[in-house]
Design a protein with these regions (language model features):
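Juxtamembrane intracellular "pre-TM" segments in multi-pass secondary transporters
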Residues: 32-63
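Helix-to-loop junctions at the C-terminal end of transmembrane segments
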Residues: 1, 105-118, 202-203
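Intracellular juxtamembrane helix-capping segments at the cytosolic ends
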Residues: 158-171
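Helix-loop junctions at membrane interfaces in 12-TM secondary transporters
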Residues: 5-7, 137-148
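C-terminal membrane-cytosol helix-exit motif in multi-pass small-molecule transporters
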Residues: 16-36, 221-229
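Transmembrane alpha-helix termini and helix-breaking/packing motifs in multi-pass membrane transporters
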Residues: 1-10, 193-207
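Structural signature of the two symmetry-related core transmembrane helices
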Residues: 16, 120-135, 212-215
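Short amphipathic helix-loop junctions that connect adjacent transmembrane helices
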Residues: 75-91
């Protein structure tokens, strides 16, 4: 942004280069071994297969969907940065900072999740996201904005992949593909609704209301997790 004087068109043309190299690598450099088809392929998304999924799995789907409603697109972090009178070329650094914190915290929290209840870790992640939402809602300076962005990155490091692990632990091995497909379907719908709702709140009531709404949904998710049968919380 700084080198091209905020010329978005030039920046996107430069971004085409790694995208083209990735496609070339997939097309000409990656060779997959041929595996013989030993049985007839069938559609696994059937009512009888869904009935085989445990109640613990469906609890994870419900909790994950509600949680996703609070995790609207990170584009709203960029929009918040624009309101702080940050120079245009520096605004992408918000996403850089968030992803840097995320990458630095993902491994240690992933290691920690191996030795503690996944539901407990998810609850701690929700608390961090609540803190991030409140800081971002109240921020009026770039320093508090960065604090909120850092908290958002920490919550990503704590929770990203955690729900996937919970799906894997609660679904039978032969139906894990179906379980992940249904979970991703519900999460995708929730993310679409979350981002659309966040946009409406932003336009009608202001930026702060968007982040406050995210915090409220996190609280609802925590309440839902407290209502989860204790046997399911030990995954």
């Amino acid at each position: 942004m700084f080198l091209w004087d905020n010329d978005f068109q030039s920046i996107f043309w430069v971004a085409v280069i790694p995208a083209a190299l990735s496609i070339a690598l997939l097309g000409f450099g990656l060779k997959e071994p041929k595996t013989p088809i030993t049985r007839k392929r069938t559609n696994p998304l059937r009512r009888e297969n869904l009935k085989k999924l445990s109640a613990a799995y469906w609890w994870v789907v419900v909790i994950g969907s509600i949680f996703t409603l609070a995790r609207f697109s990170e584009a709203f972090l960029v929009l918040r940065a624009q309101q702080m009178a940050i120079p245009l070329f520096a605004i992408p650094l918000v996403m850089v900072a968030m992803n840097l914190v995320y990458s630095l915290t993902a491994y240690p929290f992933g290691k920690l999740s191996d030795s503690m209840s996944h539901s407990k870790m998810l609850q701690w992640g929700l608390l961090v996201l609540i803190a991030a939402d409140i800081v971002l809602a109240l921020s009026s300076h770039w320093s508090t904005l960065l604090a909120g962005v850092a908290l958002w990155g920490i919550h990503m490091g704590m929770t990203q992949g955690l729900l996937a692990a919970m799906v894997a632990h609660t679904a039978p091995p032969e139906l894990r593909g179906t379980a992940f497909g249904m979970f991703n379907l519900m999460s995708g719908v929730a993310l679409l609704l979350a981002s659309a709702g966040a946009g409406v709140l932003w336009e009608v009531f202001g930026a702060a209301s968007t982040f406050y709404a995210g915090a409220v949904i996190c609280v609802l998710t925590l309440i839902g997790m407290r209502c989860m049968p204790s046997a399911y919380q030990q995954n």
